[in-house]
Amino acid sequence: MNNIPDDFKKIASSSRLPRKYCSSESSLSDDDGHEIEHVLKHGAPEEALTPDTERMVVLGQDVVQSAPASLVPGGNLSWMSKIKSAGASMMGSIRPSSSSQDVHSTGEIEKHSKKKWKARLWSTWNNIKYSSTWMSDRSDEYGGENDVVFLGRRYSTSVDESGLRSGFENFCSDYYSRLWITYRTDFPALLDTDTTTDCGWGCMIRTTQMMVAQAIMVNRFGRDWRFTRRKRSHVAAHGDEDDFDREKIQEWMILKLFEDKPTAPLGIHKMVGIAAMGKGKKAVGSWYSPSEAVFIMKKALTESSSPLTGNTAMLLSIDGRVHIRDIEVETKNWMKKLILVIVVRLGAAELNPIYVPHLMRLFAMESCLGITGGRPDHSSWFVGYYGDQIIYLDPHVAHEYIPIDINPNTNVVDSDSKKAKKCPEKSYHCRLLSKMHFFDMDPSCALCFQFESREQFDNDMRQLNLSQFIDIDQGEEHGMKRVRDPMFSVVYGERRQPPSYEREVSETEQAQADKHGFEML
């Protein structure tokens, strides 16, 4: 018990059942969900459209960042009614009218308009269902005796001598600096389909992108880098405009790796294209398991010609065994940095409590890239913990796709309104803190690490073995260092040949088997 984190001892002393803590979970009832689905499929009775509901539908990004006050539950008109009203207006716009028979007589125009508005309504529905905008500010839940452990860093949440919560503020800055890659709408169509959004099915791809983006950011800027949104006028006044531009350009170059367009080496178009080699058109709209998403990302990294990814290799283990020989091959004898992903199952139907201290230990490691997993059909990127709750970044928020231009003086203009669009940078950083109970986590997940050298890898694996968290196989000469409840095994020796149970079958045994109708295996 000496190796079990103090945080877990506090959890183990409590006998209460796990509760739901997911701060980005929707408050929709089942009836509300059915009503929305009915609106999506059949439309709703035409009603008056208020200014607030029109703003909610057309400005999809505003729904996420700053919902109108009139949409908050408890107003004069329920937000569900406004959703129906918005749906009625949008669906009504694609129905034939007596004043525009000449327009709707063209079937292709009607079909195109219907697809366009239905896709936008689906995006709005996903925003409502998954956005944490409807939840209250939970920053006051991070107070007391527990520390926040976040991707190898520990932050105190208590008030310091000056009366400030500087530790918690530093955690918020660190959390906000991580790249938050979410659903996108209105990007170029995927493959040869009309699909221009990944809402409802691309969450595991987005989760994997966030994990890899973290590795690239650490390689480029270091773990202590923090995102800043200083204005150019402020930067120019302090004389460091050139340095600011250089850093911003490098940051945007990393974002462009994951941009939602066909030419992005790690974007969703590239990943879906790789998946289509095996799935065909089912690659669009299909859910992906953690191992599938990582396998696709590994191939995308291998095919990437970007200098930002040239020194990075990825190794995926799906059987819970990491072979040092495989690592040496992938990294060319450690000439490249390693992203190591180990797919595990830490329980049958739910997370086994014995693995909670194991996960806590992982989040405290400098080499930790988090965990890709989530709840059933709801992928998330787990990045730390606070007490008995696991902290994560949720991709289930839809943002409008805006092209990324590394020229800081360039504005993107909307083709319809001819107005300049907002800088997309803000949508890649999340201010809303999301967390859930450890036991709400799906036991099927992928443990992610990044190692710069063989020395760092050996040291971390040795510490995990001494903490009774993993097995180490040192080869046939030196034997195994086993633990009671390992998450995975590291094999340093040559690949062991599985035991062979084959032997020659005698004529008598074969005759007996034939007589009784058995097959000799």
From Swiss-Prot:
Pfam families: Peptidase_C54 (PF03416). InterPro entries: Papain-like_cys_pep_sf, Peptidase_C54, Peptidase_C54_cat. Residues 90-100 have a biased composition (Low complexity). Residues 90-109, 499-521 are annotated as: Disordered. Changing G373R: In ola316; defective maturation of autophagosomes with increased numbers of immature autophagic vacuoles. Increases the number of lgg-1-containing protein aggregates in neuronal cell bodies, but not neurites, of AIY interneurons. Its EC number is 3.4.22.-. One of its GO terms (biological process) is protein processing. Keywords: Autophagy, Cytoplasm, Hydrolase, Protease, Protein transport, Thiol protease, Transport. It catalyses: [protein]-C-terminal L-amino acid-glycyl-phosphatidylethanolamide + H2O = [protein]-C-terminal L-amino acid-glycine + a 1,2-diacyl-sn-glycero-3-phosphoethanolamine. GO terms for molecular function: cysteine-type endopeptidase activity; protein-phosphatidylethanolamide deconjugating activity. It is found in: Cytoplasm. Cysteine protease required for autophagy. Cleaves the C-terminal amino acid of ATG8 family proteins lgg-1, to reveal a C-terminal glycine. Exposure of the glycine at the C-terminus is essential for ATG8 proteins conjugation to phosphatidylethanolamine (PE) and insertion to membranes, which is necessary for autophagy. Its cleavage activity is functionally redundant to atg-4.1, but it cleaves lgg-1 precursors less efficiently than atg-4.1. In contrast to atg-4.1, plays a more significant role in the later phases of autophagy and in addition has a role in autophagosome maturation. PANTHER family: CYSTEINE PROTEASE (PTHR22624:SF52), CYSTEINE PROTEASE ATG4 (PTHR22624). Belongs to the peptidase C54 family. This is Cysteine protease atg-4.2.
